[in-house]
């Protein structure tokens, strides 16, 4: 789910997750909060202990501290830790991107998120992604694995322009 900010993307994403859980109780469903505003966890009543950004920061810290591990070991550990960030609930699994502390571009976290979506999407029947407002995740092909994209907006020119840009 993508589009303009403040128009209900998170509410729609939560509704889709709940509907999938009720309609397909035997299917594996993953909800991804890809919005740094971190609202999907609240909408779904999830308590998040570890986020994707927490894992990314830990990996960077290990490298910066001169950890003697080989690069492949660090990558394998990062991949394994993704599963630590998953929150298992009744009927679905949840993971959150978190709120990167630095201002500006979320390039690094979005690149990591893209890899995580690629890894996890193979393990679930349905993956619902609550995307951040605007076009950055679309432009960076974070949602490259997406088969269906719902664009949500209001009637403002800015909102229509965001959706038109994403659509094109």
Ranges and model annotations:
Residues 75-84, 88, 93-129:
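Cytosolic-facing regulatory segments adjacent to core modules
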Residues 22, 108-168:
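Conserved catalytic-core segment of NTP-binding enzymes
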Residues 36-38, 99, 133, 157:
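Short, glycine/acidic-enriched loop or turn micro-motifs at the edges of active sites
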Residues 9:
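Conserved lysine of the Walker
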Residues 21-88:
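N-terminal phosphate/diphosphate-binding loop that engages ATP/GTP or pyrophosphate donors
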Residues 3-4:
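P-loop (Walker A) phosphate-binding loop of NTP-binding proteins
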Residues 28, 91, 148:
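Residues at the starts of beta-strands that form the adenosine-phosphate
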Residues 12, 16:
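Hydrophobic positions on the alpha1 helix immediately C-terminal to the Walker A/P-loop
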């Amino acid at each position: 789910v993508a589009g303009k900010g403040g128009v209900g993307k998170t509410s729609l994403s939560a509704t889709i997750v709940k509907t999938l859980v009720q309609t397909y109780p035997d299917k594996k469903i993953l909800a991804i909060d890809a919005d740094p505003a971190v609202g999907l966890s609240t909408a779904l009543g999830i308590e998040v202990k570890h986020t994707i950004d927490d894992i990314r920061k830990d990996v960077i810290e290990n490298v910066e501290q001169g950890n003697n591990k080989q690069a492949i070991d660090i990558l394998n550990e990062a991949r394994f830790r993704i599963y630590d960030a998953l929150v298992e609930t009744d009927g679905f699994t949840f993971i959150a991107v978190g709120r990167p502390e630095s201002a500006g571009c979320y390039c690094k976290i979005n690149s990591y998120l893209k890899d995580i979506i690629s890894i996890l999407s193979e393990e679930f029947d349905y993956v619902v992604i609550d995307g951040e407002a605007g076009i950055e995740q679309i432009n960076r092909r974070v949602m490259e694995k997406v088969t269906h994209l719902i664009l949500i907006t209001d009637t403002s020119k800015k909102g229509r322009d965001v959706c038109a840009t994403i659509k094109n």
